Structure formats: C-alpha cells, structure tokens
C-alpha cells in the first residue's frame, strides 16, 4: 500500500462525511507552503527522489481525488521555476464536475501554515489549517473540529493497512485509485518538462 496518509486524518474523514450530504460539484483549493529545498538536494533529483511533485505533491493529488470521490478527468499544470519545478500550480478536473487546484509552493514564508485546504460546496465552505483546525462556514450542525496536535493520518493509515492484512480484507486505498494517482502525478510532472 502507498502511504497516502492524509485521507486517513480525522479532520479529512470529517470533511468527507460532510461532503456526502452536499449535492453538486465541489471546488477544492489546496495550498502547500512546502518551503525551499536546494536544487542539488536528493529530493530534487528525478532519478533518486523523483522530484518534489512526485515525492510529496502526489499526496495532495490523492487527497483531492479522495474528497472528490470521482476519477480525475483532466489536469493542467504550470511552474514558476523551470530548474526545480517546486513552485507549481495544478488544476484537476473530476468526472463529477468538481474541480481542484493544488498550489505546491517553495517560495513562501515559514510563518505561514504549511498545508491549507479549502472546500466550497453547496453554498458552504470548509477550511482545514495544517491538520489542526477545521472550520465550517454555513454547515448546519457543524462549525469546527480542532485538535490539540497535528494529525495527518499516518497512524490511522498504518492501522488500516495492518487491519487489512490481519483480516485478509482489501487494500484500504483501492488499487485503481493508487494507479490513477500515480499515472496523473507522472503526467503532471512530465507536462512541466
């Protein structure tokens, strides 16, 4: 199993549950203030670390795919820095009409949160800040879900895998989705070359 842990985070699970009751297409805005890494760092080397989009950015493609609950129908991407391609804006279009933008940026301030997700659906908004604060705007019966410490779902992801192995159950992330995320992430990376 690929460790796409963010989909297992408790606040993401809450977002998914809330979206189940929101009719129509959704719009997702994922901002990742990833920070700069030198061009000669191993994560920037496509042969070793795969590059930052393949190495880390794919996690956010997975997160948006999970929340949309529909396959990715099309995608576009642009990058600021041609040398490292680590300040990227990606647009995803989903088969259900939902859209998502991923802003994976290496040129921001460390004073700004690293990961922020905004979801717009059915006249309502959800905002997840750094996997600590989830705030709802216009959601009947829901206004916030805050955690004492950040939880990006690593433990729940590992638990789901172990449980599947113990019980002989299916993969916690369907193989078709894993292959789709991998294919789309590679296509995005290749489109930036």
Language-model features: where?
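Short aromatic-enriched loop/helix-cap "lid" or pocket-rim segments at secondary-structure transitions
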Residues: 12-14, 38-43, 87, 114-115, ...
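Predominantly a Rossmann-like dinucleotide-binding segment in NAD(P)-dependent oxidoreductases
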Residues: 6-78
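C-terminal helix-rich "cap/oligomerization" subdomain common to oxidoreductases
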Residues: 95, 160-193
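A short, polar/proline- and glycine-enriched secondary-structure boundary/capping micro-motif
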Residues: 111-116, 137-148
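Active-site loop of classical SDR/Rossmann-like NAD(P)-dependent oxidoreductases
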Residues: 148-159
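Alpha-helical elements of Rossmann-like donor-binding domains used by nucleotide-donor carbohydrate transfer enzymes
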Residues: 10, 14-17, 63, 89, ...
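Contiguous beta-strand/loop segments that form the cofactor/metal-binding neighborhood of enzyme cores
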Residues: 55, 61-133, 158-169
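Beta-strand-loop-alpha-helix segment that lines the small-molecule cofactor/substrate pocket
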Residues: 1-4
């Amino acid at each position: 199993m690929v460790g796409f842990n963010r989909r297992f985070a408790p606040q993401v699970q809450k977002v998914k549950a809330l979206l189940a009751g929101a009719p129509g297409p959704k719009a997702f805005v994922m901002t990742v203030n990833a920070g700069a890494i030198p061009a000669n760092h191993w994560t920037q080397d496509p042969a070793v670390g795969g590059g930052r989009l393949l190495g880390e950015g794919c996690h956010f493609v997975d997160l948006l795919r999970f929340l949309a609950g529909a396959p990715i129908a099309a995608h576009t991407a642009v990058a600021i820095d041609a040398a490292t391609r680590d300040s990227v804006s990606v647009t995803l279009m989903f088969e259900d009409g939902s859209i998502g933008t991923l802003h994976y940026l290496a040129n921001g301030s460390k004073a700004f949160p690293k990961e922020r997700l905004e979801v717009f659906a059915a006249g309502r908004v959800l905002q997840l800040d750094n996997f600590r604060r989830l705030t709802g705007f216009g959601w009947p019966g829901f206004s916030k879900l805050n955690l004492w410490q950040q939880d990006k779902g690593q433990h729940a992801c590992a638990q789901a895998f172990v449980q599947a192995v113990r019980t002989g159950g299916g993969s916690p992330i369907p193989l078709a989705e894993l292959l789709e995320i991998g294919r789309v992430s590679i296509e995005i990376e290749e489109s930036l070359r």
